[in-house]
């Protein structure tokens, strides 16, 4: 089980609802992923009438927990306003907080992120902040009251996998009581397994699934990879070594194999 604030879930895969070729493929992908939490964009919901209504109806039929986000927001004021609108629309205090600094890299504005998180937490929100892998930023978010931290593995949609493994491992080591979710930059099931092997609590995926040739199949693949990676972490992974170590004991080796 993984805990997000006061709620527990069986699946460690969170999934986004954007970029799918069709609504039916989105539904199939969410189902096959086993995800219990789906992120949705307020901008999509308010963009226009019937399209938004149909989309929301499809999400509701899946019986999942909705995590609205502030995707596309580029200022503290915009992010806070969007979060408040999302709380009214979706009737939840959860918000995936994004404050973007650069249009090309979609890198988080970490200064604005901490400021927005502080404002929202004081207003009763339970914040899921999308941030870089910088420990000092993560610590400031924790100090502000965030119980969940969502660092990127690489830039959004890049499919590069974990770029700074050491920094992510440091986050896990230094924030043992915080729920850590790798968010953005993963492209293959093996990337997700690696994140879980580092001890992260969950993974959020969207582009890697939605843009796959067969999204629903890819969703199932990520599900299995995340389960395998977590199980490996819980089993206690053997650390790397600089030299070979025989798996067969040398005791009892025949004399003719002995080194003179």
Swiss-Prot record:
What does the entry give for GO biological process?
A: thiamine diphosphate biosynthetic process
Looking at the Swiss-Prot or TrEMBL record, what is one Pfam family this protein matches? ThiG
Pathway(s): Cofactor biosynthesis; thiamine diphosphate biosynthesis
Q: Where does 1-deoxy-D-xylulose 5-phosphate bind?
A: 157, 184-185, 206-207
Q: Which reaction does it catalyse?
A: [ThiS sulfur-carrier protein]-C-terminal-Gly-aminoethanethioate + 2-iminoacetate + 1-deoxy-D-xylulose 5-phosphate = [ThiS sulfur-carrier protein]-C-terminal Gly-Gly + 2-[(2R,5Z)-2-carboxy-4-methylthiazol-5(2H)-ylidene]ethyl phosphate + 2 H2O + H(+)
Instruction: Give the UniProt subcellular location, in the record's own words.
Output: Cytoplasm
Q: Name one GO cellular component term.
A: cytoplasm
Keywords attached to this entry: Cytoplasm, Schiff base, Thiamine biosynthesis, Transferase
Q: What is its main location?
A: cytoplasm
The EC class name is transferase
Which Cys-Cys disulphide bridges does the record give?
none
The UniProt entry annotates the active site at 96 (schiff-base intermediate with dxp)
Question: InterPro entries attached here?
Answer: Aldolase_TIM (IPR013785), Thiazole_synthase_ThiG (IPR033983), ThiG (IPR008867)
Please give the Gene Ontology molecular function terms for this protein.
thiazole synthase activity
- As recorded in UniProt, its EC number(s) are 2.8.1.10
The protein's job, in short, is: Catalyzes the rearrangement of 1-deoxy-D-xylulose 5-phosphate (DXP) to produce the thiazole phosphate moiety of thiamine. Sulfur is provided by the thiocarboxylate moiety of the carrier protein ThiS. In vitro, sulfur can be provided by H(2)S.
Summarize the subunit comment.
Homotetramer. Forms heterodimers with either ThiH or ThiS.
What protein family does this chain belong to? Belongs to the ThiG family.
Q: What's this protein's name?
A: Thiazole synthase
Q: Which organism is it from?
A: Rhodopseudomonas palustris (strain BisA53)
Upper taxonomic classification of the species? Bacteria, Pseudomonadati, Pseudomonadota, Alphaproteobacteria, Hyphomicrobiales
């Amino acid at each position: 089980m993984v805990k997000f604030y006061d709620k527990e879930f069986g699946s460690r895969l969170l999934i986004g609802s954007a970029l799918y070729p069709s609504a039916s493929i989105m539904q199939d992908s969410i189902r096959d992923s086993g995800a219990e939490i789906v992120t949705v964009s307020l901008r999509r919901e308010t963009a226009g009438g019937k399209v938004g209504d149909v989309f929301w109806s499809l999400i509701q039929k899946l019986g999942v927990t909705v995590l609205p986000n502030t995707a596309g927001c580029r200022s503290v004021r915009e992010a806070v306003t969007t979060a408040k609108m999302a709380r009214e629309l979706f009737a939840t205090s959860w918000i995936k907080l994004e404050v973007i600094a650069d249009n090309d890299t979609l890198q988080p504005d970490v200064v604005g992120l901490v400021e927005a998180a502080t404002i929202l937490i004081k207003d009763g929100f339970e914040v899921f902040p999308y941030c870089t892998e910088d420990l000092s930023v993560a610590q400031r978010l924790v100090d502000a009251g965030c119980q969940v931290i969502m660092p990127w593995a690489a830039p959004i949609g890049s499919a590069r996998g974990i770029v700074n493994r050491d920094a992510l491992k440091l986050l896990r080591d230094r924030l043992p009581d915080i729920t850590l979710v790798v968010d953005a930059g993963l492209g293959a099931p093996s990337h997700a397994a690696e994140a879980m092997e580092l001890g992260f609590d969950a993974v959020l995926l969207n582009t890697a699934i939605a843009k796959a040739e067969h999204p629903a199949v890819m969703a199932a693949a990520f599900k299995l990879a995340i389960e395998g990676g977590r199980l490996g972490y819980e089993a206690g992974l053997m650390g790397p070594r600089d030299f070979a170590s025989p798996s067969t004991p040398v005791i009892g080796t025949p004399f003719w194999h002995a080194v003179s």
